[in-house]
Amino acid sequence: MNDKERKPWVTASDVAARAGVSRSAVSRAFSPTASIAPQTRERVMAAARALGYQVNLIARDMITQRSSMIGVVTAGFENPFRARLLSDLMAALGQRALTPLVTNAEDPRQVRQSLEQLLSYRIAGLVMTSASPPLSVAQQYLEHRIPVVMINREANLPGADVVVSDNAAGAVQAAQRLVRAGARRLAFVGPRGASYSARSRAAAFEQALGRGDAFGATLARVLDTPSDTHASGIDAARQLFAASERPDGVFCSSDLLALGVIDVARSEFGLRVPDDLCVIGFDDIPAAEYDAYRLTTLRQDTRGLAHAAIDLLADRMQTFDGPSRTRVVPVAQVVRDSCA
């Protein structure tokens, strides 16, 4: 199709003419917070649908001097938990008529450049779901008075708000569940050095075992992995079960790690789950339900995390100044066959 054949864009003036309203009424109809009679809004929307009208967000933001674009920084798109969280974030932003600009923080060499590029879009806020971007980059946004909300990251950036899952409560529940199942030599597996969430879960798990919640169980091994992937779980399991005294209960900081541990325990060491080994994960990804695993886990409420984050962001977009706030979202224990 050449330029002469390309269908011209429908304008707000076209919609106004068809609906029999003013141009400004069309603008108000597409602004969720604007004052406009319901019947007028519906007439405008009907005309827009009939004509195939789409709001020019860039033009609207330039006119109003208020951006509707929100930067979302994430990593590990192949990770089922992060994919679900990203989906819920998109939905939460859409409910507030905000437009996400997603940046992949997987490659540390490109993170800073990508984050700095977001500044050129004059975004209205930033949501960080990955541990990869350095806080110094997020600090740049705060200096431009752009709100920053971090999900499952440590609350150590003044002015930024944080939403986290209740890692401590989940870890204590994992310790208690393992002990009730009869496990006595326990191990923790997770990327403590690279992940705030794994670090928090490991610390709470260790504290639970040390203060009497464990009823005689001991923490035999804490294994720091490079990541929270299935491959890291495989490597960790080989180290754990090659030792002279194997653990009989393992708490993993993610479900993917737990699935890797189970695979190796069965295929390479002939262990039966849960008869010889109890395993608990964290996240409740779809694979945790598979018959091959039936993984007991702690479910993170991705919808709750997403909505809490966007609520904080929207509030900060209205009133930027104020102390940092932290919201803790409960987790839910899901009991399946791997540790009943």
Regions found by a protein language model. Name each.
Residues 1-67:
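N-terminal helix-turn-helix DNA-binding module of bacterial transcription factors
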Residues 2-7, 65-176:
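Alpha-helical recognition/docking segments in bacterial nutrient-uptake
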Residues 57, 75-84, 102-110, 153, ...:
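Hinge/beta->alpha junction and helix N-cap segments in small-molecule ligand-binding domains
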Residues 111-122, 232-245:
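Short, well-structured alpha-helical segments in soluble
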Residues 122-130, 187-190, 223, 244-254, ...:
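Periplasmic-binding protein-like
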Residues 185, 217-220, 271-276:
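Short acidic capping loops at alpha-helix termini that bridge into adjacent secondary structure
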Residues 243-340:
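Flexible loop/turn connectors
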